[in-house]
Amino acid sequence: SIEELSKYMPAVQSIACVPVGLTKYRDGLFPMQPYTKKTAGEVIDIIEEYSEKFKKQYGVRVCYPSDEFFLKAERPMPSEEYYDDYPQIDNGVGLWTSLRDEFFYELSVCEKAPTHKSVTVITGVAAYPLIKELCDAAHENYGIDVQTEKIINNFFGENITVAGLLTGTDLIEQMRGKIRGELLLIPIVMTIDYTSHSTENNKFLDDITLKEAEKALNVKI
């Protein structure tokens, strides 16, 4: 695919290489296997062989492995320079590095203002290590009592680890009775209308509304 797309460069400006999401609903579909640590690492190596060549030719890498590949391969995330101004960030390429860098920069320039707020933050399995790191830093700098939890995707299957495909059903079932504090913070991409920060009429992929989830969990989302 990379070789075919490379014929259209520089009209093709960037290529995101993302692992296919395999749900548990695959009866009768073409047999496909999820990536392992080994195969994810092999994919990264192939992509980087091409990207080094493109870097010399075009000045940018052009093709980039998504964050999921690095997580699956258990390799460290690249630095900001690797991503050439993040042309594929909306496809999960460099999102981890960008968020972490931005968070710790803001933390370094903000005044420390101790607070006694108590909140619970949830995310998907993939992003949990990063979100936990950021929440722990917020606690250390501001005294916020932050409980960080990961939601396992039982609705689509445990192979689906991104926060954007979590449902209200899994949120309610896994967090009922476990929430600490007066607020539950969720990734906005869990909602269908993720351009809106309002809970009015917004809902999850399984049609459970935010209002219904708030009522079931007895907490403000």
Label for each model-derived stretch:
Residues S1-E3:
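Active-site-proximal cofactor/substrate-binding loop regions of enzyme domains
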Residues S6-I221:
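Auxiliary Fe-S-binding modules of radical SAM enzymes
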